[in-house]
Amino acid sequence: MMGEQSGQTRCYYNMSIEQFVPADHPLRAIRPLIEAKTIRRECRSLYSPIGRPSIPPEQLFLALVGGYLMGISSDRKLVMELQCNMALKWFVGLGLDEEPWDASTFSQNRRRRFDQSGILEKLFDQTVKRALQENLISRHVSVDGTLVRANASFKSFVPIEVAMDPEEYKKRLRSSDDEDHQGPQDPGNPTVDFRGQKRGNRTHRSLTDSDCRFVSKGTLGTGAYPGYTVNAVMENRHRLLLGLRAEIFRSSTSEEQGVLALLDRAKRRFRFKAKSLGADKGFFHREFIAGVFRRRVQPHIAADTRGSSRFHQRVRMRRRGEPYRLSQRCLKKIEELFGEGKEFHGLRRFRRRGLLKV
């Protein structure tokens, strides 16, 4: 017999939010690893001792982490998911009858607390330290870099203006006033036509994001676009990132200085000293190899045909051993991390502007 839906709804329900989260849900395994007391201790100095109680900082942090884990790259979409996604609501600690916050809550807390204090970076370091204590981190690392598009367009780049003397500035103002009296030269929607003009990082800057640059891998057939360089250091056993940092693009070899800085940071903050370092051909440069040797790390770098210095020769000699082969096999792991970040976690293009905020 065909059933039919009852038109009467129940007024009372006896249930818990736990019932809506499957036992094998990934967020269930991650939630016990995040300690609310640690977050509150790190954030205590960012709040006033008087006034109206704020949203608990651990809930804000859990909402951001949960959004990134689920590939949510918009604050408004995150608020919508907090309303209807029971697993995310349970992860953050909201009850069934609790309303999520406004989207501006996240942007205002980033601007007032998170950007300047570096609190998110400190919490990331706490995760790495805990992994070191549990002996989950190998002493063999892989390094790589990628280019991430900035939240700026080609048309936002204008020539860098040099300082003018007062008379020249007044003359320029008078000429612009004359042009205004003559009427608009391009009525309607004004466009920026830069065809035929030579534009580069030495002569142009973006009005939208002054820290971004024209970035390119330096290979034939690849055009430049506004973006940043993102470097990472990964341990080879469990694909844990020991360091990740966005930097202003300097040249096609700017990844090298960023990677060495991340190695120094890991040694300074975690007392972590790598034994070997795997990298692709893009790092087969004399200065980078010399920097790796100075840090007493064995470079397992893919060798190129160019380069005849003693540093290049020492790297080529290591290609014959099994450790080199294993390090090269692990390179795909860090490339997969970048691929997953761009595909699922919004790393393909930054939403915010400025080096401090990206």
Please place each PLM-identified region on the residue numbering.
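Polybasic low-complexity intrinsically disordered regions
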Residues: 83, 92-291
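Acidic, metal-coordinating catalytic cores used for nucleic-acid/nucleotide bond scission
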Residues: 51-55, 278-286, 305-307
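Hydrophobic, well-ordered secondary-structure elements that form the walls
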Residues: 63, 78, 102, 232, ...
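Helix-centered, glycine/charged polyanion-binding patches within enzymatic domains
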Residues: 166-167, 179-182, 286-356
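Short, well-ordered loop/turn and helix-capping segments at boundaries between secondary-structure elements
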Residues: 69, 84, 88, 129, ...
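Charged, often Cys/His-bearing segments associated with DNA-binding zinc-finger transcription factors
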Residues: 1-35, 174-194
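Basic, low-complexity intrinsically disordered segments
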Residues: 2-5, 9-11, 30-34, 39-136, ...
